[in-house]
A protein has these predicted regions:
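Walker A/P-loop
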Residues: 20
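Hydrophobic anchor at the beta1->P-loop junction of P-loop NTPases
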Residues: 11
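Conserved phosphate-donor/acceptor-positioning beta-strand/loop module used by diverse small-molecule
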Residues: 97-117
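Glycine-rich phosphate-binding loop used to anchor ATP phosphates in small-molecule kinases
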Residues: 55-99
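The conserved Walker
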Residues: 14-15
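Small-molecule kinase domains that catalyze NTP-dependent phosphoryl transfer to phosphate-bearing small molecules
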Residues: 122-162
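Phosphate-binding P-loop
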Residues: 1-6
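Conserved substrate/cofactor phosphate-moiety recognition/catalytic segment
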Residues: 23-67
């Protein structure tokens, strides 16, 4: 499969927003041709220290390259990342991905920080910097008119239905081309 035939749905959001949970639950649905990946679970070798936005772009490029070269049977990859929406758009355009969508998974700060403390045992990520990152991502998503899945008050199942609808719409566009 070449890049022009691969559909990419980038899920972005701050730590604790619910991206990984949604990606794992989506995989449990076993939708033919669709697979979710936690992109941060790959180590990118770099000769120089990159800024975090460059590292996230490198990670996104790695997954696009990996998925487009292998015979995986994947038509649509859902990539769980923390890349900024603007940077994700740049990378997707540079890589000539014809079918792409960026979706923000968002959550109010109190709930996100509660998840980081209680559910994930990562209290070090519940900080002002992560709150600012979440606000920045929300601002970009709003400015770019992106779909937003707000997990603040919705059950995982309801948020998963929202994601499944977005995946279905993108998959339909790919298959009808």
């Amino acid at each position: 499969m070449n890049k022009s035939q691969l559909a990419i749905l980038v899920l972005t959001g701050a730590s604790g927003a619910g991206k990984t949970t949604l990606t794992l639950k989506l995989n449990e649905l076993e939708i033919p041709g669709v697979k979710g990946f936690n992109c941060d679970r790959v180590k990118i070798e770099s000769d120089e220290m990159s800024a975090s936005t460059d590292l996230q772009a490198d990670i996104l490029r790695y997954w696009i390259s990996h998925l487009s070269q292998s015979e995986t049977g994947i038509e649509l990859a859902v990539l769980d990342t923390q890349i900024s929406p603007h940077r994700a758009l740049e990378v997707l355009n540079q890589e000539a991905i014809n079918y792409a969508q960026i979706v923000l998974v968002d959550c109010d700060p109190a709930k996100r920080n509660e998840r980081l403390h209680m559910d994930r045992s990562q209290p070090e990520l519940a900080n002002a910097q992560m709150d600012c990152w979440a606000a920045y991502l929300r601002g970009q998503a709003d400015a770019l008119g992106l779909s937003i899945i707000d997990t603040s008050n919705d059950s995982v199942e309801k948020s998963l239905v929202e994601l499944e609808l977005l995946v279905g719409d993108l998959l339909t566009r790919v298959r009808s081309s």
